[in-house]
Amino acid sequence: GMAGGSGEQALLTSGAVQLANFYGFSNSTIAGATDSKGDDAQSGLEKSLNITMAAQSGANLITQAAGTQAGLMVSSFTACVIDNDMIGSIARSLADIPVNVDTLSLELIESTVNNEGHFLGAKDTFSRMKSDFLYPKVSDRTSVDEWTMAGRVDISQKATIKAKEILKDYFPNHIKPDFIKEIRNNFEIKIETHKMRSQ
């Protein structure tokens, strides 16, 4: 069968996207399929390889990139949360590195070299920490000691907790209440709106 998370699939997708771009066609591709059955290292390896290659090849739209497992046969809320961090990192890696008078900060460099010897107290550093860094929701960037003291919680455990938090209070609001009322008036929908919320 198809090995959607394989390097060969990544290569084929990359080639197809580059051909579409060469001929001036808008393009859409799936990427992020994995043959893994769970939220494990294989899943991360296959998804990140395929999504990164599709993105770096210039895909206009990448679909089916988050939450699926087992060759697109299973959807996982935990995987959606993990994949959100992964896709954020991939998107961040595609950004340009702006080089201009502001980003070079030559005066700050001169002042730092001649004074404190570090940039930690500079307003510019703090500002860039807010704009230039992606802070993941569940990926762990702590030290081994901090991670151990916090209970050695892995990414799947953190993502499961985060998914439950999101689903607990989430209710779609992209359909206006008037439309929902009209739909309910025209179709026999047996489940009440308040029961559609996660318990």
Predicted regions and their residues:
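Glycine-rich anion/phosphate-binding loop at the beta-strand->alpha-helix junction
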Residues: 1-86
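Catalytic-core signal marking the mid-to-C-terminal active-site face
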Residues: 78-199
